[in-house]
Regions:
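Active-site machinery of serine-nucleophile hydrolases
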Residues: 69, 73-133
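Short alpha-helix in the alpha/beta-hydrolase fold that links the catalytic acid
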Residues: 84-85, 212-224
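Cell-envelope and extracellular/periplasmic
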Residues: 73-80, 116, 140-141, 157-159, ...
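Primarily recognizes the serine-hydrolase "nucleophile elbow" in alpha/beta-hydrolase
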Residues: 150-194
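Gly/Ser-rich "nucleophile elbow"/oxyanion-hole loop immediately N-terminal to the catalytic nucleophile
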Residues: 60-65, 120-158
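C-terminal catalytic histidine-bearing segment of alpha/beta-hydrolase fold enzymes
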Residues: 203, 207-209, 215, 226-340, ...
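Sec-dependent N-terminal signal peptides of Gram-positive bacterial secreted proteins and lipoproteins
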Residues: 5-24
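A domain-start/cap signature at the N-terminus of enzymes
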Residues: 23-69, 155-157, 162, 167, ...
Length: 344
């Protein structure tokens, strides 16, 4: 822990003096090393499936610190074999010293990147909800001396964003905050009611060609906020253009996870390019470097005590999506489009 405090202090000094003005790229240079620091793990077989994962551990020798866990869930096609789930995104940046230092109260966190069993043609299907919970429970037991069970966070992109929402709906007591990115699921009102006390940070690209911003993502946000008891704590990040932190276009408007991977800051440590951030009351939110997504996450705790799940969770709730009625979808699309145009 002493090493982590020294590292955090040096990073703070460098940021204040301007030495670290290109912090994002300094971290990016360490990305390969960060990915190599992840270890392999696998959960117990549950309902016929065992979820494997790779994880980063912040624990040092003789370390008694309690660290939060960040669960990261990949998108479709990014989990064909073990270890592949951290390759398409830059989530490994969160394992670097700079990003680890942003976790409030611990100056570090476990990063657990789980894998959907795509070789079985499973893309975060509902049948993996309980096996994923079992893998998380097992990880907590194996690392009980250093896990802060009151600070478990979950996020992911595309199909992983869908699974983020479904896990939170199935087990709302477990997660202190969640951060779905371009989630490929439109939860119904019975589902979003179960998220009422969970802070949610939703991120999406306005031009997303796969998960439509206006008919899917904005409607998901509206449904969540309509039921939320913590509106002021919720965040909605909209990316007019989906860019890398240096302002260059990503390969697709679907790739909004890079903004989250870089903690919503540009290469110059300013606002992430082409982004807009609001809270659940519609108020614009200004981020001040280095307090981005990580600082937001780590500021929340839950009452979860680490008790293992006794069953498959609330299957009725996590299976309930919003109506697929075409007319309703079209209405939502234009309602949200006009709101975006006229309200900004």
């Amino acid at each position: 822990m002493k090493t982590k405090k020294i590292t955090a202090f040096l990073l703070a000094v460098m940021m204040l003096t301007g030495i670290f003005s290109v912090g994002v790229f300094a971290s990016y240079a360490d990305l390969g090393e960060a990915k190599a620091s992840f270890q392999d793990g696998v959960g117990p077989e549950t309902n016929g499936y065992a979820i494997d994962y790779v994880y980063y551990s912040p624990v040092e020798e003789n370390d008694s610190t309690k660290y939060p866990i960040v669960i990261w869930l990949h998108g479709m096609g990014n989990g064909k074999k073990p270890g592949e789930q951290i390759v398409p995104s830059d989530i490994a940046l969160w394992a670097t010293d700079e990003y680890q230092s942003r976790f409030k109260g611990s100056e570090g966190a476990y990063i657990l990147a789980a894998r959907s069993l795509e070789e079985k043609n499973l893309f975060w299907d509902d049948c993996l909800i309980h096996p994923l919970r079992a893998a998380i429970d097992d990880f907590i037991v194996k690392n009980r001396d250093n896990v802060d069970v009151s600070r478990i966070y979950i996020g992911g992109y595309s199909m992983g964003g869908k699974m983020t929402l479904k896990m939170a709906v199935a087990y709302p007591e477990m997660f202190a905050a969640i951060f779905p990115i371009c989630p490929a699921w439109l939860p119904g009102t019975s589902a979003t009611a179960r998220l009422a006390d969970i802070p949610v940070w939703l991120t999406s690209g306005v031009t997303d060609p796969l998960v439509n911003y206006f008919s899917m993502v904005m409607t998901t946000w509206n449904n969540i906020i309509a039921k939320s008891n913590v509106k002021a704590d919720c965040r909605f990040a909209s990316l007019k253009n989906v860019l890398y932190p240096d302002g260059k276009l990503t390969e697709s408007g679907h790739h909004s996870w890079f903004a989250v991977n870089y903690d919503m800051f540009s290469s110059g440590n300013g606002d992430y390019p082409s982004s807009k951030l609001v809270d659940g009351n519609g108020n614009k939110v200004k981020l001040t470097y280095p307090d981005g997504v990580i600082s937001w996450l780590s500021g929340f705790t839950s009452d979860f005590d680490g008790t293992k799940a006794a069953d498959g969770g609330n299957s009725e709730a996590y299976g309930s999506g919003a109506s697929s009625n075409v007319f309703a979808t079209v209405i939502n699309f234009f309602k949200n489009l006009f709101a975006y145009i006229f309200k900004g």
